Amino acid sequence: LASGHCNKLEAKLAQFERRYPIDEIRRQIADDCLQRAADAQGIYTLTVPTGGGKTLASLRHALHHAQTHGLERIIYIIPYTSIIDQNAEAVRDILGDEWVLEHHSNLDPEKQTWQNKLLSENWNKPIVFTTMVQFLDAWFGGGTRGARHIHPMANSVLIFDEIQTLPVKCVHLFCNALNWLVQFGGSSAVLCTATQPLLSACGVDEFPEDKRALVKARGLLQLASNAEIMGKNQALDKLFADLSRVEIKFNEKAGGWSVDEAGAFLLTQFQTALSCLFIVNTKKWAKDLYQYCQQQNVPSEALFHLSTNQCAAHRKALFARMKQRLEKKLPVVCISTQLIEAGVDISMACVIRALGGLDSIAQAAGRCNRHGENAGKGRVWVLNLQEPSLAKVLPDIDAGQQQAERVLREFAGQDILQPKAMRQYFEYYFYQRSDEMAYAVKNSASGSLLDWLSDNGYNNYAAKNDQRRQTKQYPLLMHSFKSAGRAFQVIDAPTRAVIVPYGEGKALIAKLCGEYEPKAFYGYLNQAQRFSVNVFPNVWEKLIESNAIHEIADTGVYYLNERHYSEEYGLAADEVAPMDFYDL
């Protein structure tokens, strides 16, 4: 990485206006990141409240750190494909297109021909954006598809954005891989979030001794000395207090809020706040609440629905419309799933959040009074909705709800976004789920996936090693690499991607269907990323039965019939009326 990259970023930062007091705080955060860039290599944390400008601040740290230590590239690992585009675009605008690579995983062809292998993305640019799914699959997934991405991770700076979204079952696998990269691969890492999870050894000091010893033995992050870039506890507390822009109220109702009750509460808030955002846990709740607002005659131009059933290009167009209305002080009501919580720069006067994990509540609060533009503090409401049991279908949300409710009660009347409350939440959360963190293998009595990749003590041949040690023979290697690769899935119900006929997506489908030259095909496929939707197995089967999904020329790439994509909800398992697609 050349000094020219640093100079371009410094010039851009110098141009930023300071319209609100928060802009001065963001500048100080970026300055602290620059100051700490000269530190020794290692694993660092960057704990910054939502809206603190951590994307460019972490880039500033990484560029100068890479230049200081002669590192080759910066790799941004982001939780969702839905926010890669905007983060990459922000960096591309500063450094130039030739320096930035976006590597999505959702449209990689399922069939690995030799042409696919030759033309699939290499991480050969100075700055790479990818997902946590890609990172974990490279290390632990079966086959060779992801293995080519391991060596570029060495001698690099890895920035993990919203690290709290790391799946609980992957905690020990992730920690061991990252420790290896830093200790033996010559890399450095920065874990960015407003809600720092307890991934290091010091984070489990409050656990009972037996559980603390087990968790540490399985592997936790070996952080650098003075690892928090923003300083120690007192400095962090002051930063969060200075950036406090909202007041959070837990409005609990016995038996939970029904759709009609929650909808009526939303519209009551809308009468006094010009803009309202309601974030829910499931797509069904989002659709039902949106339809309630329609029935109550909320003007269609002011009402928005967002979910991952809409492709990225579709959501981007909706965000643009919302921002235009907000800038003009026009009314906005938005019903969204959790996708709006990560990396979306939008600011509402009022936010309502369905009860979820405390980290999710904090992220939702980051969409309220984001720039401190409103007099006084913004209002964030947390409601316990009437939902079916989420324990089996969405266990992370279910566990988060339980522990968040506990902390909300314990810290009643206090700022629950303060680091002390968040730390208490994660202590409860990780203690409750500590047995899951080594990736327990379903329907197996032979330990966890971490066991399979380490000493594998449950292996039937393990007893032979005791005999070999007694006779001073080398032990047999017991690792079950192949079985571990087959069993590993970042997402329990892995999705499959389909290109949808929204906007330019329709023309790209036609081009892909008529293109036989591999390089050109991959070019169109890269453009089609923004027009793809990830589909869960049960919905995929229903679409197949309806003849709504078609494969492109035996390539393992699929597209959707336009009768199954709507302007309001995106991809629909049931057929919708034919529609025209307009550029928004």
PLM regions: where:
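Inter-Walker segment of RecA-like/P-loop motor cores
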Residues: 96-140
